[in-house]
């Protein structure tokens, strides 16, 4: 692409981007928010231009054009600085769809232009995606998504991608479903690609991307690839389809649509569609050659995003959907071939009042000046340069076998999930039986078609051979001048040959009609009627299955909700049981501590009482000792007193040991108290003895006094008598 053309495209795409953002500027973010296919294509176009400009000598030109575009009269550069505000309170400032789109696109574009080191890109994207998570958590806009362009992805290591994936996988409250799916795809794709020789490669400019599995449209949009880019595939991949365009919405709704696709027969394509800016452009890769167990995106519900983004399904809730039969196969675009002429001046069948959809399209070919060819009816199959224009669904007969296999696989899966005794067991068995019968009939029809084609080839060869013989006979006839019998014989042979040729032509015409009926024609034939009946039956079964799937989805949704409630209740019950066990442990420990405290308190009170009693007893013992000492001084026989004193000292030592040990045996204390009582009794007895001794001593003293008085009186009397006698 020349630079001038790139700058012109960038100018147009920047204007389209500014117009789209301005239109969405006041749409508040919510759980129903999502980007339409038109908006996603506008974003892809401007990011592609910036990516392509990186390989030119004016790589900042496209980015400057984008920055100078205006939104509501203000340049995008200034608007971006205002809503970004240096990363302060971003989730409150970016509250509409338009601001969200502007914020993401400008961040990616600036990163593409200014960053080339993987660590720098990773650091920027880490901060950026944390802001995105904050926005999604605040507004619950789970269907909003603008993925990383391929120009940045190719610079990141797998470790960086896994770390960015963890930003979303650990932020459960962010509701960034599509970002999580995007990084999950990159992770799965990396490990599958590293261990496989199978690949599908898409490239434009300086970027390329390879994958061995199906690639959904929103992944291709995020990576900024289009169906006009260079596509390559490995030779082992046979059933590869590239979806290129949305034809119309199905059943007048936007929940599903009919798409055009190209089957990739060749290993390399310089684009399979024209490079346009149409709003209904689509690009997705369907790979039916790889094992379905490793390809989670071949399901049509996941491969092609509905127009209303909030109606898209997640992998966990997506039912098997392979309605590829409704989509239209078209030929790959070749820029070297002239475009077909659509205005021929010939009145089309629908112009006469017929239905355009039901009328066969007539192809008008340029007249040939050759006289012989002019009088012959033109047979397109004999024209080697004939390229048919397909106006409705054209699926190879062999692909019906693939679809039937998928339907049987789907029914087997439904039967496994519903169980052997499920409600729909009979319907499933009936559907499988009819599919098996249809498969057998289809195989029979295929064999008949192949036989007819072989017969057609044989008849064609025979016709060519007879034509050659007729021409030789004509030459012989024209070369004879006489009227011999050989001329009559030759005429007869020619007539017979012509009759045989007419019969062969008639047979060939019938065969061609039958083949046209099988492929795409409207000629009534047995095979056509059978196929129409089978299609009607398949559609009816599809409707029935869809209704049952809706019922099942509702039941599963309710069951899932109940399971979540039960799981939460179980979790709360488990937490409650743990709390009860913890409380019980604490109560037990508190009771133990209270009993120990009470015991210690009782022991302390008892010890205090015992100490007081011991102090009192000590004082009493000391008093007894003092009295015993006094008694000892007043009594000559001190043997019993010494025994009591030693016994008291012994008791005192025991009491002292008891006090020093911080307590004592209450029984021993009681015994000691009783012993002390005995000692007190003995002491009292001793006291009684001392009193008696004192009384006796006083009596002795009195008697001694009387004796002394008596002695003195006797001495006095004796002296008196002696004096008297002398």
Curated annotation (Swiss-Prot):
Segments of this protein annotated with the region Disordered: 342-361
Subcellular location: Virion
GO cellular component terms, A-Z: virion component
Main location: virion
Main function: Structural protein that forms a matrix surrounding the mature virion (MV) through interaction with protein A26. Presence of protein A25 in the virion structurally prevents direct virus-cell fusion mechanism.
Range of residues in the leader sequence: none
Start and stop residues of the Sequence repeats: 612-634, 639-661, 667-689, 691-713
Similarity comment: family membership: Belongs to the poxviridae A25 protein family.
GO MF, one example: chromatin binding
Lineage, opening ranks: Viruses, Varidnaviria, Bamfordvirae, Nucleocytoviricota, Pokkesviricetes
Keywords, alphabetical: Late protein, Repeat, Virion
Gene3D superfamilies: 1.10.287.1490
Name the UniProt record assigns to this protein: A-type inclusion protein A25 homolog
Source organism of the structure: Camelpox virus (strain CMS)
Miscellaneous remark of the record: Some orthopoxviruses such as cowpox, ectromelia, and raccoonpox viruses, form large cytoplasmic inclusions within which mature virions are embedded by a process called occlusion. In those viruses, A26 bridges mature virion with inclusion bodies through interactions with proteins A25 and A27 on the mature virion membrane. In camelpox virus, the protein A25 is deleted in its C-terminal region and no inclusion body is observed.
Location of region: 4 X approximate tandem repeats: 426-713
GO BP term (any one): viral process
InterPro entries cross-referenced by the UniProt entry: Pox_A_type_inc
Residue stretches of biased makeup (Basic and acidic residues): 347-360
Binding partners and assembly: Interacts (via N-terminus) with protein A26.
Presence of the UniProt keyword Ribosomal protein in the record: no
Domain of life: Viruses
């Amino acid at each position: 692409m020349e630079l001038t053309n790139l700058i012109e495209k960038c100018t147009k795409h920047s204007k389209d981007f500014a117009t789209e953002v301005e239109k969405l500027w006041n749409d508040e973010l919510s759980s129903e928010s999502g980007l339409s296919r038109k908006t996603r294509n506008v974003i892809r176009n401007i990011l592609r231009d910036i990516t392509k400009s990186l390989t030119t000598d004016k790589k900042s030109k496209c980015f400057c054009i984008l920055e100078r575009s205006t939104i509501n009269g203000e340049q995008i550069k200034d608007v971006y600085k205002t809503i970004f505000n240096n990363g302060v309170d971003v989730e409150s400032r970016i509250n509409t769809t338009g601001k969200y789109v502007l914020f993401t696109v400008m961040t990616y574009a600036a990163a593409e232009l200014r960053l080339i080191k993987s660590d720098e890109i990773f650091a920027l994207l880490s901060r950026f995606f944390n802001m995105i998570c904050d926005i999604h958590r605040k507004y619950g806009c789970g269907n909003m998504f603008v993925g990383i362009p391929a120009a940045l992805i190719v610079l990141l290591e797998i470790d960086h991608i896994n770390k960015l994936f963890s930003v979303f996988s650990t932020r459960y409250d962010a509701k960034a479903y599509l970002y999580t799916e995007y990084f999950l795809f990159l992770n799965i794709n990396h490990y599958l690609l590293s261990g496989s020789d199978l690949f599908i490669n898409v490239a434009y400019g300086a970027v390329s991307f390879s994958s061995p599995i199906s690639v959904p449209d929103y992944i291709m949009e995020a990576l900024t690839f289009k169906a006009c880019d260079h596509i390559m595939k490995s030779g082992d991949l046979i059933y590869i389809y590239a979806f290129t365009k949305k034809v119309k919405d199905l059943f007048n709704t936007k929940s599903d649509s009919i798409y055009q696709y190209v089957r990739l027969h060749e290993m390399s394509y310089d684009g399979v569609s024209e490079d346009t800016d149409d709003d209904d452009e689509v690009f997705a890769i369907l790979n039916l050659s790889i094992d379905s167990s490793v390809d989670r995106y071949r399901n049509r519900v996941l491969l092609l995003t509905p127009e209303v983004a909030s109606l898209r399904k997640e992998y966990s809730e997506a039912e098997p959907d392979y309605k590829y039969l409704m989509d239209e196969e078209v030929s790959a675009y070749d820029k070297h071939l002239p475009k077909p002429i659509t205005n021929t001046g010939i009145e089309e069948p629908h112009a006469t009042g017929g239905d355009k959809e039901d009328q066969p399209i007539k192809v008008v070919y340029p007249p040939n000046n050759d006289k012989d060819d002019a009088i012959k009816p033109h047979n397109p199959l004999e024209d080697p340069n004939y390229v048919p224009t397909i106006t409705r669904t054209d699926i190879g007969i062999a692909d019906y076998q693939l679809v039937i296999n998928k339907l049987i696989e789907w029914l087997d899966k439904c039967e496994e999930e519903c169980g052997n005794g499920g409600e729909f067991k009979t319907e499933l068995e009936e559907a499988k039986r009819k599919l098996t019968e249809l498969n057998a009939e289809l195989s029979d029809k295929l064999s008949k078609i192949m036989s007819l084609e072989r017969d057609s080839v044989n008849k064609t060869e025979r016709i060519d051979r007879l034509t050659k013989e007729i021409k030789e006979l004509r030459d012989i006839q024209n070369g004879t001048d006489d009227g011999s019998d050989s001329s009559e014989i030759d005429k007869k042979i020619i007539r017979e040959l012509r009759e045989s040729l007419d019969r062969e032509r008639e047979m060939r015409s019938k065969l061609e009609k039958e083949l046209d009926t099988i492929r795409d024609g409207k000629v009534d034939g047995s095979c056509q009627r059978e196929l129409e009946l089978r299609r009607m039956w398949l559609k009816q079964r599809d409707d029935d299955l869809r209704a049952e799937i809706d019922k099942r989805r509702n039941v599963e949704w309710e069951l899932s909700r109940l399971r979540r409630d039960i799981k939460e209740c179980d979790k709360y019950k488990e937490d409650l049981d743990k709390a009860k066990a913890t409380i019980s442990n604490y109560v037990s420990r508190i009771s133990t501590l209270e009993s120990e405290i009470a015991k210690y308190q009782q022991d302390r009170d008892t010890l205090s009482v015992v100490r007081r009693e011991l102090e009192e007893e000590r004082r009493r013992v000391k008093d007894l000792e003092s009295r015993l000492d006094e008694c000892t001084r007043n009594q000559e026989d001190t043997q019993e007193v010494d025994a009591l004193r030693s016994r008291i000292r012994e008791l005192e030592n025991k009491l002292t040991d008891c006090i020093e040990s911080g307590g004592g045996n209450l029984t021993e204390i009681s015994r000691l108290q009783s012993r002390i009582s005995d000692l007190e009794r003995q002491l009292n007895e001793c006291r009684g003895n001392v009193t008696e001794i004192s009384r006796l001593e006083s009596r002795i003293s009195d008697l001694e006094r009387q004796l002394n008085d008596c002695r003195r009186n006797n001495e006095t009397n004796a002296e008196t008598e002696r004096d008297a006698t002398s």
